[in-house]
């Protein structure tokens, strides 16, 4: 999801 993508930054 988008939240997960943010954490992967």
Swiss-Prot record:
One GO process term, biological-process aspect: neuropeptide signaling pathway
A single cellular component GO annotation: extracellular region
Record bears the keyword Cytoplasm: no
Cellular localization per UniProt: Secreted
In-chain residues carrying the UniProt-annotated modification Leucine amide: 9
Top-level taxon in the UniProt lineage: Eukaryota
Keyword Hydrolase belongs to the record: no
Entry keywords, A to Z: Amidation, Neuropeptide, Secreted
Record function comment: FMRFamides and FMRFamide-like peptides are neuropeptides.
Family per similarity comment: Belongs to the FARP (FMRF amide related peptide) family.
Protein's UniProt name: Extended FMRFamide-6
Organism classification: Eukaryota, Metazoa, Ecdysozoa, Arthropoda, Hexapoda
């Amino acid at each position: 999801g988008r939240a997960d993508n943010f954490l992967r930054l």
